[in-house]
Amino acid sequence: AIAAKKLGKPIRTFAIGMDVDAIDLKYARQAADYLHADHTEVIISRDDVVAALEPVVAALGTWDITTIRASIGMYLVCRYIHEHTDVRVLLTGEISDELFGYKYTDFAPGAAAFQAESQKRIRELYMYDVLRADRCISVHSLEARVPFGDLDFVRYVMAIDPAKKLNTYGKGKYLLRKAFEGDWLPDAILWREKAAFSDAVGHSMVDDLKEYAESLYTDGEFAARAAQYGYARPFTKESLLYRELFEKYYPGQAEMIADYWMPNRAWPGCDVDDPSARVLANYGASGR
């Protein structure tokens, strides 16, 4: 929104979604229309998702579940941009979650816990969200500009009283939304429930990945093959698939990723066995 106003001419925007149940496409279109952007929608299928999986893992250098899931859509939309446009520099929104809160940080037991979690997530960015953005974009000869990652901005936001970031307003990321009140974005976009990127592409994408992994291993094969890994042992067939692809390209290097990205399981409401916000009790309207 800021770029569109500052440039004074239509910007190029891109959105990606599954062919059967994309969530964010309609909202991206509304925002693009409001900003008078030159907007492109990239539609993908189950076959596209499965075919992209191995090159995504090879590019990322991770076995982490949520990083790989979220990278599929970004990888494919960046590939489209490289192959079909002359755009080579992208604005992307990484790091707003770490600064202003995830869905699961609604369950933070207090301001100090919220702040400590934000600090942890920022320290680990290079293994998760920033890894995803950097690799998915650069592997297609594109460059990223990450405004939320500006060091002055990060320091400013982290100096705000964390009590003001707690979701006591009935809406996550309240401070960030409030900052864009006015004519920056339509209210329907500004105040809608956020969906995680891997979910917003369409719930079917993660479901397809899980089903594909289930088709590759019997229960016995899964147990035997997962047991080979002492570090960050795969705990689902999906995580085993990702680990085996990782080991194909980065054998014996699993320890460069600290752990599976998960909500803070020590918090009430966050003791879950899947990183998706879909499994949280507060998911609500995020999937609509």
Predicted regions and their residues:
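ATP-dependent adenylate-handling active sites, centered on carboxylate activation for C-N bond formation
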Residues: 1-184, 199-212, 224-235, 239-288
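Surface/interface-facing alpha-helical segments and adjacent flexible terminal/loop regions used
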Residues: 216-221
